[in-house]
Amino acid sequence: MPELPEVEVVRRGVAAHVVGRTVSEVEVLHPRSVRRHVPGPDDFATRLAGRCLTAARRRGKYMWLELGGGPEEVDAGEAVLAHLGMSGQLLVQPDEAPDETHLRVRFRFDDGGPQLRFVDQRTFGGLSLTELVSVDGVAVPEPVAHIAPDPLEPVFDLEAAVARMRKRRTGVKRALLDQTLVSGIGNIYADEALWRAKLHWARPTANLTRPQARTLLVAAVEVMQAALTAGGTSFDDLYVNVNGESGYFDRSLAVYGQAGLPCPRCGTPVRRDAFMNRSSYSCPRCQPTPRNPHY
């Protein structure tokens, strides 16, 4: 699933190519891709026609397109919320480009320029039209209101996140993946941040010192910024930017997906452990198992 850096790459592409344009038509080719829009596909398409996409924003793994224009009775505080799921893609394509095999939703614009296409092989992702609400002075889609700011947001409070993490009674990786604590971090960047901070994934959060928790969250910021510079992490063609190009941060991963290969820091073979129906990767020497692990 795309994590913060991948979604931010897509957001920047959408902002560059789509923001400021007015929707002329929306074509929903697969109703499952707008299943979270309860009034249904026809309502989704009808309410977007004539609306201007005024901004592209993101929190964690969610991005949204703020809307302006439309009839006077339309609430201006609305947005198209996008969640990419496992395989969702937002592509900017010229009108004459052939339809992708898994094209689900198409946006056409009144300037006759490139389309915005939502492509999703597994249909776990989706789009919905939702109201914006204010959370601590920031306008976010109502379905996203419960998640915490992510580490790349200006409103992210590092010291507050450190304090919240140390109050949890859980394992440190579980805490990193908890989107109500810090949003945007998934399996890949959690493992990479833990490696950089030299912490085992099952270390109890209650046993973290304040400097350790701070070091870990700073490591998460640093690794995600590095991934963003590299265009994100692509293991297959399911994650691409708006131009259909893959990221290349997978070449820089220290431990994630590197089981049996030498740790870049000490040379010890990287270990893979089962974790929450997925995997955790760590260096047994740099990240020793704690005395009282929280699995």
UniProtKB/Swiss-Prot annotation:
Chemical reaction(s) catalysed: Hydrolysis of DNA containing ring-opened 7-methylguanine residues, releasing 2,6-diamino-4-hydroxy-5-(N-methyl)formamidopyrimidine; 2'-deoxyribonucleotide-(2'-deoxyribose 5'-phosphate)-2'-deoxyribonucleotide-DNA = a 3'-end 2'-deoxyribonucleotide-(2,3-dehydro-2,3-deoxyribose 5'-phosphate)-DNA + a 5'-end 5'-phospho-2'-deoxyribonucleoside-DNA + H(+)
Domain of life of the source: Bacteria
ZnF (FPG-type) ranges: 254-288
Binding site for DNA: H102, R122, R168
Primary gene name: mutM
Gene3D superfamilies assigned: 1.10.8.50, MutM-like, N-terminal
Main function: Involved in base excision repair of DNA damaged by oxidation or by mutagenic agents. Acts as a DNA glycosylase that recognizes and removes damaged bases. Has a preference for oxidized purines, such as 7,8-dihydro-8-oxoguanine (8-oxoG). Has AP (apurinic/apyrimidinic) lyase activity and introduces nicks in the DNA strand. Cleaves the DNA backbone by beta-delta elimination to generate a single-strand break at the site of the removed base with both 3'- and 5'-phosphates.
GO aspect biological process, one term: base-excision repair
Top-level taxonomy: Bacteria, Bacillati, Actinomycetota, Actinomycetes, Pseudonocardiales
Subunit structure: Monomer.
InterPro entries the UniProt entry points to: DNA_glyclase/AP_lyase_DNA-bd, Formamido-pyr_DNA_Glyclase, FPG_cat, MutM-like_N-ter, Ribosomal_uS13-like_H2TH, Znf_DNA_glyclase/AP_lyase, Znf_FPG/IleRS
Protein name per its UniProtKB record: Formamidopyrimidine-DNA glycosylase
Keyword Hydrolase appears in the UniProt entry: yes
Molecular-function GO term, any one: class I DNA-(apurinic or apyrimidinic site) endonuclease activity
Co-factor: note: Binds 1 zinc ion per subunit.
Annotated keywords: DNA damage, DNA repair, DNA-binding, Glycosidase, Hydrolase, Lyase, Metal-binding, Multifunctional enzyme, Zinc, Zinc-finger
SUPFAM superfamilies per UniProt: Glucocorticoid receptor-like (DNA-binding domain) (SSF57716), N-terminal domain of MutM-like DNA repair proteins (SSF81624), S13-like H2TH domain (SSF46946)
UniProt-annotated catalytic positions: P2 (schiff-base intermediate with dna), E3 (proton donor), K61 (proton donor), R278 (proton donor)
Cofactor(s) required for function per UniProt: Zn(2+)
EC number from the UniProt entry: 3.2.2.23, 4.2.99.18
Membership in a protein family: Belongs to the FPG family.
Keyword Acetylation attributed: no
